[in-house]
């Protein structure tokens, strides 16, 4: 594994270390001030753990980065650690997930590490990871948790490209196709509440023939951006978003979300079979839907939403990719 924790005074950065025997289990672990930078045994990519920590740690004391070649689920692992008493903010990255989870319990498949070079024109000729999957655990105490997944999605979209849109409540879309998904869970340790924010992003094209709609991939927009560079671009902005949300809730993000709302003005079908026209979101992040019975406010995490028809002018499905977290 790769681990980075901000060095303490009197300790030099760049010290290489191996994980302690038996420390792969759940629970609180003490990595001290040890540092592993760059490639580590079992990892395909060289990860910018130090650069991320230098940007994040001043605003998030105790912040650490951990990268694993493979795990069942980054969200599941962080939830296990929280239940075992973990208290430090931690970014956990996995090059491969074997039992990834999405919203409403759906399975999420991460791309195999070391995937073949992308076939999108302009993509890097170097081997790439087909997807980026990571989870961030940190103490969070907002007055209202409503709209958190929307704020996280907005942070991802803002960090990447103006063309990206947001599908309520937890997806990032490119031309009506899913590019990324978000899964947020919470847990408690003593008097503190912790959030685990999981994000999965499709990077390279993959076989999408078994999916109803083939997902988008980041190489269509940013062919030179690989998983480590993508992580460095996303995480500092994500931490700032979470801290802003903790203090002010969703309201400061509402207007920016509306500008990227993929559903607004479109006929949609709810998971209960009812239909209506999406009318944006309110200051808490609730979905507003015009129905024959009047305005309906959708807040339940158990409600799924899909357009009743494709967006006019959107690219036709057919570019293969890797499904993202949630739905």
What residues fall within each predicted segment?
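Long, positively charged amphipathic alpha-helical accessory segments at protein N-termini or as interdomain linkers
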Residues: 2-10, 14, 31-45, 51, ...
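Short loop/edge segments at beta-strand edges and connector loops
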Residues: 69, 166-168
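N-terminal lobe of the biotin/lipoate ligase/transferase fold
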Residues: 2-159, 224, 312, 317-327
């Amino acid at each position: 594994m790769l681990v980075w924790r901000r060095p303490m005074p009197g300790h030099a950065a760049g010290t290489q270390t191996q994980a302690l025997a038996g420390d792969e289990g759940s629970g609180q672990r003490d990595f001290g001030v040890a540092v592993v930078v760059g490639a580590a045994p079992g990892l395909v990519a060289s990860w910018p753990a130090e650069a991320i920590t230098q940007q994040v740690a001043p605003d998030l004391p105790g912040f650490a980065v951990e990268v694993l070649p493979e795990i069942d689920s980054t969200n599941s692992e962080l939830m296990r650690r929280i239940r075992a008493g973990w208290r430090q903010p931690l970014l956990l990255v996995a090059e491969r997930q074997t039992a990834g989870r999405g919203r409403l319990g759906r399975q999420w498949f991460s791309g195999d590490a070391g995937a073949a070079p992308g076939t999108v024109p302009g993509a890097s000729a170097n081997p790439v990871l087909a997807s980026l999957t990571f989870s961030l655990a940190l103490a969070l105490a907002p007055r209202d948790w409503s709209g958190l997944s929307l704020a996280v999605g907005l942070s991802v979209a803002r960090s990447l490209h103006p063309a990206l849109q947001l599908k309520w409540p937890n997806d990032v879309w490119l031309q009506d196709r899913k590019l990324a998904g978000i899964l947020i869970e919470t847990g408690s340790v003593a008097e503190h509440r912790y959030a685990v924010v999981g994000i999965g992003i499709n990077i390279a094209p993959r076989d999408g023939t078994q999916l109803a709609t083939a997902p988008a991939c980041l190489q269509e927009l940013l062919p030179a951006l690989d998983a480590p560079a993508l992580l460095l671009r996303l995480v500092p902005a994500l931490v700032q978003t979470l801290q802003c949300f903790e203090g002010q809730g969703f309201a400061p993000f509402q207007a920016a979300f509306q500008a990227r709302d993929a559903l607004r003005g479109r006929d949609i079908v709810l998971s209960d079979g009812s239909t209506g026209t999406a009318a944006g979101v309110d200051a808490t992040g609730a979905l507003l839907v015009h129905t024959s019975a009047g305005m309906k406010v959708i807040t339940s995490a158990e409600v799924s939403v899909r357009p009743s028809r494709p967006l006019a002018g959107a690219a036709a499905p057919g570019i293969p990719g890797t499904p993202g977290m949630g739905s």
